[in-house]
């Protein structure tokens, strides 16, 4: 893989991990167009590892929030009042919201990886329509501070649904938050914070299992480093842009994007460019993924 291609893959990962449009679907199409097959263990490792860049972007962007939540949760636990402050409650609610995806990922991983590209196309369109409904019907009034245990669990279930390729972790969780009445920005902010535990755990597992595939592959290793750095830097910028966008604008552009992408993948399958079978990249850590 050339360094230019690696940088482009990193950019695609960053853009589509955090926007509610599915990084899995876009990496699939982009890989096919550039002639990279996921039967190649090196390319599969590359796709997996560059997702660590977007995880790093979340950690850096929300470092102050994460530090505050961890400190408050730990302090409350030590003092025997784990839910004593808003920050402590939010920290524990994020862990609560992580459970559905963790359980679903453990139980359904092999079945999910067997899903084909028609599922990706259908997920893109289907969730696009649900996002449209959320945009039109939701109240958009609640803030992150208003998150309760029920909200965290329901948005966590939405995060688990992102294990289905083409759904988008950020897409399902932002949509879930909006349907519960949160503002667009609050839904996105909670979505990103919720991604931290699951993407760290799933990312560490996937890195451990795929890094050996690049052993002795100097060119691929360099390309992977480039792609990961690009995905981290671009991912940071995308997070900042998306939060600013959602403060004053709607998600309609992403509804159109999802439906168009789903239709494009369906057309590529029908034309024989993409196989109908399960040759998509593994979904981002639910992440997975946010992915973003």
UniProtKB/Swiss-Prot annotation:
A single GO cellular-component term on record: plasma membrane
One Pfam family of this chain: BacA
Catalytic activity: di-trans,octa-cis-undecaprenyl diphosphate + H2O = di-trans,octa-cis-undecaprenyl phosphate + phosphate + H(+)
Sample GO molecular function, one term: undecaprenyl-diphosphatase activity
Stored InterPro entries: UppP
Annotated EC: 3.6.1.27
Keywords per UniProt: Antibiotic resistance, Cell inner membrane, Cell membrane, Cell shape, Cell wall biogenesis/degradation, Hydrolase, Membrane, Peptidoglycan synthesis, Transmembrane, Transmembrane helix
Reported function: Catalyzes the dephosphorylation of undecaprenyl diphosphate (UPP). Confers resistance to bacitracin.
Superkingdom to which the source organism belongs: Bacteria
Transmembrane segments: 1-21, 46-66, 88-108, 114-134, 192-212, 225-245, 253-273
GO biological process, one term: response to antibiotic
Family listed: Belongs to the UppP family.
Protein name: Undecaprenyl-diphosphatase
Additional observations: Bacitracin is thought to be involved in the inhibition of peptidoglycan synthesis by sequestering undecaprenyl diphosphate, thereby reducing the pool of lipid carrier available.
Cell location: Cell inner membrane
Bilayer topology: Multi-pass membrane protein
